[in-house]
Amino acid sequence: MQEIYLTDREGISPSRTEQAIRQLIGQYPDLRNVLIIPPDYTRCYSYAGELTQILYRILSPHAAVHVMPALGTHMPMDAAERRSMFGDAIPDSAFLVHNWQADAIPIGTVPKAFTEEISGGLYGESIEAEVNWRLLEGRYDLILSVGQVVPHEVVGMANYSK
């Protein structure tokens, strides 16, 4: 895969962004099933909604495209939140809801020795890593993570003791 970087001190135009995304997607000419994983509404001002709209517009004419917002343990997005973040062009039927209590499956464990090492001894327990089962089922030709979707532990309330 060719990496594509955009930089401009004055800002990157929507047309330049779409051009770069078309260049990226052009590297995968035979896509039939695509999963896009943007952040949820708690990151509505991240530009991930706009990027997801562009991806859907480019991919949906020739592939089945699903959008599964990375909810973590947050509440599912309602229709108004989806429209606010992703616009009207992506149909409700394209959205999948991540149910963290039922859909997460274990994929491995971060060993206690490693957590002790990287935390300088401040934390010393193993951590089980889980992902949504859809990531591993083999249905999708391409899975795209959009925006700041990063793994993190559930250790407290956001903007508080987390």
Task: Name what the model sees in each region.
Residues 1-16:
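N-terminal amphipathic/basic leader segments beginning at the initiator methionine
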Residues 2-6, 154, 161-162:
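Small-residue-enriched flexible segments
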Residues 20-35, 60, 139:
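Glycine-rich phosphate/diphosphate-binding loops that line cofactor/substrate pockets in enzymes
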Residues 33-44, 66-72, 143-147:
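Short glycine-rich or small-residue beta-strand-to-loop segments that form or flank ligand, phosphate
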Residues 43-65:
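Histidine-anchored nucleotide/phosphate-binding helix
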Residues 54-58, 156-162:
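A short, gly/pro- and small-residue-rich
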Residues 62-73, 94-101:
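A generic structural motif
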Residues 77-157:
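An acidic, phosphate/nucleotide-engaging active-site surface
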